[in-house]
């Protein structure tokens, strides 16, 4: 069974995060957990195997991945959140969209995992800031993975005008 948020905040040891990809084109599982029932079963299995946190991602970030619609991402995420919250899961939501993060937090998710470092949706850090109990995982980002030509961008496409910490701190 997953641990509670107080234990996560106070933890002095390593925690295990299980990854639940609910995408059609995941590089790691090829869409095995896209159906809500499959997502729930896999999330429960990871919890039973010792995962402290389940990280739900509904949009692939593999090289060359194409964006899914906001509505599709939100529907996938909320289906998984609504299935796993009653099971006692601590949920991390892997998203770059403020609207998806907000909806997931309102449905009980506790952590936002932003692979864009706040670069893709400038409102996302504000959504997290408005939820004081929410943890925010901020990652460095090289730009959207599928550019106009479908190629991976150069490392210098990330722009943090005032530095990473200052730009996401507010």
Identify the role of each PLM range:
Residues 24, 61-62, 107, 115-170:
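Conserved anion-binding
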Residues 66-93, 99-102, 129-141:
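Alpha-helix-loop-beta-strand connector modules within alpha/beta enzyme cores
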Residues 43-44, 77-81, 101, 122-125, ...:
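Generic structural signal for well-ordered alpha-helices
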Residues 13-16, 85-94, 110-111:
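Short beta-strand/loop segments at the ligand-binding rim of alpha/beta enzyme cores
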Residues 22-41, 66-67, 92, 153-169:
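Active-site mouth loops of central-metabolism enzymes
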Residues 26-28, 52-79:
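Glycine-rich, proline-tolerant flexible connector loops at the mouths of alpha/beta enzymes
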Residues 20, 46, 50, 54, ...:
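Conserved, mostly hydrophobic/aromatic
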Residues 1-24:
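N-terminal amphipathic alpha-helix/helix-capping segment at the start of soluble metabolic enzymes
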């Amino acid at each position: 069974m997953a641990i509670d948020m107080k234990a996560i905040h106070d933890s002095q040891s390593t925690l295990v995060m299980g990854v639940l990809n609910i995408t059609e084109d995941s590089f790691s599982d090829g869409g095995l957990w896209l159906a809500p029932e499959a997502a729930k079963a896999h999330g429960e299995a990871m919890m039973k195997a010792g995962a402290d946190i389940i990280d739900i991602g509904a949009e692939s970030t593999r090289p060359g991945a194409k964006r899914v619609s906001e509505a599709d991402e939100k529907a996938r995420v909320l289906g998984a959140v609504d299935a796993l919250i009653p099971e006692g899961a601590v949920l991390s939501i892997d998203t770059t969209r403020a609207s998806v993060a907000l909806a997931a937090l309102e449905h009980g998710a506790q952590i936002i995992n932003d692979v864009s470092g706040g670069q893709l949706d400038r409102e996302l850090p504000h959504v997290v800031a408005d939820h004081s109990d929410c943890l925010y995982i901020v990652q460095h980002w090289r730009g959207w993975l599928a550019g106009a030509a479908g190629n991976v961008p150069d490392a210098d496409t990330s722009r943090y005008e005032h530095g990473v910490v200052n730009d996401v701190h507010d």
